[in-house]
Amino acid sequence: MPKRTDIKSILILGAGPIVIGQACEFDYSGAQACKALREEGYRVILVNSNPATIMTDPAMADATYIEPIKWQTVAKIIEKERPDALLPTMGGQTALNCALDLEREGVLEKFGVEMIGANADTIDKAEDRSRFDKAMKSIGLACPRSGIAHSMEEANAVLEKLGFPCIIRPSFTMGGTGGGIAYNREEFEEICARGLDLSPTKELLIDESLIGWKEYEMEVVRDKKDNCIIVCSIENFDPMGVHTGDSITVAPAQTLTDKEYQILRNASLAVLREIGVETGGSNVQFGICPDTGRMVVIEMNPRVSRSSALASKATGFPIARVAAKLAVGYTLDELSNEITGGKTPASFEPSIDYVVTKLPRFAFEKFAKADARLTTQMKSVGEVMAIGRTFQESLQKALRGLEVGVCGLDPKLDLSHPESMSTLKRELTVPGAERIWYVADAFRAGMTVEEIFAMNMIDPWFLVQIEDLVKDEEKIKTLGLSAIDRDLMYRLKRKGFSDARLAKLVGVTEKNLRTHRHKLDVFPVYKRVDTCAAEFATDTAYLYSTYEEECEANPSTRDKIMILGGGPNRIGQGIEFDYCCVHAALALREDGYETIMVNCNPETVSTDYDTSDRLYFEPVTLEDVLEIVRVEKPKGVIVQYGGQTPLKLARALEAAGVPIIGTSPDAIDRAEDRERFQQMVERLNLRQPPNATVRSEDEAIRAAAKIGYPLVVRPSYVLGGRAMEIVYQEDELKRYLREAVQVSNDSPVLLDHFLNCAIEMDVDAVCDGTDVVIGAIMQHIEQAGVHSGDSACSLPPYSLPAHIQDEMREQVKKMALELGVVGLMNVQLALQGEDIYVIEVNPRASRTVPFVSKCIGVSLAMIAARVMAGKTLKELNFTKEIIPNFYSVKEAVFPFAKFPGVDPILGPEMKSTGEVMGVGDTFGEAFAKAQMGASEVLPTGGTAFISVRDDDKPLVEAVARDLINLGFEIVATAGTAKLIEAAGLKVRRVNKVTEGRPHVVDMIKNDEVTLIINTTEGRQSIADSYSIRRNALQHKIYCTTTIAAGEAICEALKFGPEKTVRRLQDLHAGLKA
């Protein structure tokens, strides 16, 4: 069946902001779907609230709406655009839930919109646990024994039937949000209460425990003629009980016999047929009991998922692209496989001659109070994938690509320590983020495969592989460097050992080891990912390294530029940097360069095989980058686009003779090194908060007295504000130094005077060495002290006088020219009274670049990439700042709901995982829409609770007056209430938590409060008011921890509920007029 001609326009729903469980894999699938459908001549309309995505670029769709993905908003877009069809399978759980809402509210029927890719019944049958259970029984497949509950009474009835331990999962939530494993009644009641609260349908599925079972996934694609292919089988290294997003996974499955594989294969096809997936990809998850071989179906997702992004990158088969074409009527045999240049049809199952390993990346160091144990609720924030010819090689490559300070199976424990064995037993039994390293330590401690298997049920095949690597390490330790001959070196490199790990074992520097390896003539070769195990020749350069005979890299002699990506997502370094890398590749390709991308993150658009001319799916480490440079000999390498990851390599690459283009590593160092930076600030007569760099406790206390409290303290060279704190007195400083000196490994600690109540600004600029153009000035809504990645910001600024803005422009230009920036630069400034302070300068791409580009209609990342390659801003015709005639607000999105026990207060350490954008004619409208996009429900009336620190008291009267005019009643704690009364306003007093009951938390628990403004100062007051914020989060009450955000909310509420939807393309056209 060729494509349908009865539909002309298709609406695609995106996934919204990046949250744990739903990351940039949906940008990758959505971008592919847009491309695939436009190629076929359809008009594509896209809705996504996340400005940091490639899919929201104005060139990706015919009409782009950066608007909240809520059915009310989408209904307005449908009314305006009148699409014929809606494709809901590309935007994760967010898009599916929104599509079901549109169906239920009658919007699709009213405007005659057909759902394609999956219909409402299919989605419901797969997502609704009881319907799914019945469907599986009808085709003779078992599901775990389970029951469904809509209340605590029903939950207890199910428990009687199943017993402990049991697994609890809320319906229609994603990444296992709200679920968990209960071993006793107390835990059971706590998890059920949380789950009922978080499930949009107030429904729980309670399963028998399958903990310790083996877990497998099948990625299946099916068309409407019932052609089915298995793209890839995936095996979880961690047994059941750990969410698949937090498991180490391996593709293809390693421990299945051929017969077992065929059984799973047939079962997964039967599942798709029964559920009715006719057009596109699904993943089906199975559990198998290692003792009895009993098989159960755990779940299926009738959409493109995290696993399908992994399967696409692992095999080279573009699932999302194919799924989009199937949704408009094609069948698999009609589509050709792009990777083999059309030599094979899409109905050929990929076959692979290598092993892929995915490791999750966690961010527990950001959330001190979080429970770091892995359960059925997803907690990882990113992932890394590696390709090798054996499991050992791909595992070791993934370990070093993770960027957690290891270069392989580094030891975690000092085994001579008396406590070490009990720590080891605990870490092996209860899964945590570092279990694989403890498994290696267990072998070092002399434990056997059987003993370890008995503790954690990890398949013995995997354990034997790790044991073998540990044996090799023990052997190398006894040798000197000269004793490693060519044969041994070759054997070790084939097993994936990094130069850095071998150097550590032998006791030499990494550089010495590399020189020795090169002398022995041991170099990697590069193989291609081609979907057909090299059966057909392929022109697609999607490459990975291994140590074998034949090299398939086949480099050209064209002018090449290499872009280093950002590695795995983490808090502080996410999709924004990937966006910049993609834009650099697109711009330089257009200009005739051959572009080479190096990255190891399977979720992103940068690792799509057609983003750049050549893709090396490799860890972004010194060794791996140098080997690629040796083969490709690029004319230039870009390090300023991938966040901190490539920047850390800049000096070493430069020393090895790699041509780094753009801002020089020395200039980057001048901005990052405090003492050199200070000299520059003084030379330009600019202001900086008084500061000092200290190397001991005594020195710190003396310096603090001179600078004056409060202080911002932090280790030098960090991204995302890791281990930053604000201290208000000497005992707090002493406590910080005791805890933080470990963070800084003898590197100094920085003290800055904290600018209390200052307004912060972010400025992005592009410089070509002679001219500087300001991209935008953004005003932060939260005042200084909140990390810039966590603060909401407004473009253009909503309350900065023009003369201050002009002064800031001048300062930024001076610094750019002084540093000799070539490319992008970001400056953070603070305004206290009339004084402008320079907080920091980053001569690289910053996380605001995508947001700014969407606001001003110009891609800064593309312009800066061309500047790095030698063009001037005049040649590029970008010579003056574009100031939009509308307001845009960027708001951060946080993962606090996933981490019970963590305080949802904002501070100098970054905690957000993603962002949304709201656009409006006024600041209030834009702010209101950004809140909506971040799934924050703004109250329209009720009772507002206010309690603020002394510094904020002068501002409280205006906020209280606004709220009363908007119809709120005010309650406040004694000190704040006194001020509000003094202004002649009506207020009710309420006790602080420390003052006895009934207190404010009682009011929150009784749902008597609808809005909370709670600001704090110092460690004690933060601790005292913790329960206010945590309860507000659990009861979904809008809570802000800064007075400035309180003022912004009043603006948003004045705007009211009526919001207009705006096409990005129209906004940009208005700027050019």
From Swiss-Prot:
Region called Allosteric domain, residue ranges: 936-1073
A single cellular component GO annotation: cytoplasm
Biological or metabolic pathway of the protein: Amino-acid biosynthesis; L-arginine biosynthesis; carbamoyl phosphate from bicarbonate: step 1/1; Pyrimidine metabolism; UMP biosynthesis via de novo pathway; (S)-dihydroorotate from bicarbonate: step 1/3
Stretches assigned to the MGS-like domain: 936-1073
Organism: Pseudomonas syringae pv. tomato (strain ATCC BAA-871 / DC3000)
Gene responsible for this protein: carB
Binding site for Mg(2+) 4: E840, N842
Name assigned to this protein: Carbamoyl phosphate synthase large chain
Subunit note: Composed of two chains; the small (or glutamine) chain promotes the hydrolysis of glutamine to ammonia, which is used by the large (or ammonia) chain to synthesize carbamoyl phosphate. Tetramer of heterodimers (alpha,beta)4.
